[in-house]
Curated annotation (Swiss-Prot):
It is found in: Cytoplasm. GO terms for biological process: maturation of SSU-rRNA. It comes from Corynebacterium aurimucosum (strain ATCC 700975 / DSM 44827 / CIP 107346 / CN-1). Signal peptide: none annotated. Monomer. Binds 30S ribosomal subunits, but not 50S ribosomal subunits or 70S ribosomes. One of its GO terms (cellular component) is cytosol. One of its GO terms (molecular function) is ribosomal small subunit binding. It comes from the Bacteria. This is Ribosome-binding factor A.
């Protein structure tokens, strides 16, 4: 029987443990710009997926995703040992790391929304001085035409 609440608690705990281990215990310069964003554990509590993002060294520089992935792969065993020591469970889940694409997707959505707002403002500006193509009241009645 799957206990989703227990899996969620364990995932949150794994996220915290891995993030602090990368910050304090793992000595790899390639992991300095890695941020752990989320963790998910399967229902049987045997596999954990840890999601991460990578920042660039400067605002304008592109992050090195390949180096971060390689560093996480190399530190996977050490991180699993640390997670096993911190968790009080019979079986330590295996760790797999995935690049979190949510920040890039949300930035893209923000860009699309900003473009839509700019187009709406442009259309509103054009609409202010617009006149109807025909008469102002195209639905005249016959009584009005005789006057």
């Amino acid at each position: 029987m799957v206990d989703h609440a227990r899996a969620a608690r364990m995932a949150k705990r794994i996220q915290t443990i891995v993030a602090s281990a990368i910050e304090r215990q793992i000595k790899d310069r390639r992991l300095e710009l890695v941020t752990i964003t989320d963790a998910r554990v399967t229902g049987d509590l045997h596999d954990a997926t840890v999601f991460y993002t990578v920042r660039g060294t400067d605002i304008g520089t592109e992050p090195d995703y390949d180096q971060a992935a390689e560093a996480l792969t190399r530190a996977k065993g050490q991180l699993r040992k640390i997670v096993g020591d911190e968790l009080s469970v019979r079986f330590t889940p295996t760790l797999s790391f995935e690049l979190d694409t949510v920040p890039e997707a949300s930035a893209h959505m923000e860009e699309l929304l900003a473009r839509a707002r700019a187009r709406d403002a442009e259309l509103a500006k054009l609409k202010e001085g617009a006149q109807p193509a025909g008469d102002a009241n195209p639905y005249k009645t016959s009584d009005e035409e005789e006057d």
